[in-house]
Amino acid sequence: FAITTEHLTATVAAQGCSSEVRRGDLVLVRTGQLSRARRDGWGDYAGGAAPGLSFTTADWLHDSEIAAIATDTWGFEVRPNEFDVAFQPLHQVAIPNIGLFLGEMWDLDALAEDCAEDGTYEFFLTAAPIPVTGAVGAPVNPIAVK
């Protein structure tokens, strides 16, 4: 399932004013993919078909001026990719050209449940990577404080 700009803006609108996306924000997108893997088995979770952001969201990612976006999927963007000429093309645009931090495989279930319960989708979030000199990616320990 390809998540489009329309899906993102509709979700923000449905969640209300505490879900407004502002410059510098870290946006979290929960698809339920990690929950499904826990329930049904890991199978092809890492490498198989998965919901994720459509390549068409690149303009929204840039125009919104967010600092980062993270999902509960293994690859952030929809798999299989929307066209065959490039592997994970949204990565190829978002990282070097937008300068966007991408988070993958984030466990968002407890946070999503808490947000739905109190109707507040705004919180302080930190996700410091382990310090590895010269690395282009590293595990993080995300912490949300409401």
What does each model-identified segment do?
Residues 1-146:
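Active-/binding-site microenvironments in catalytic and ligand-binding cores
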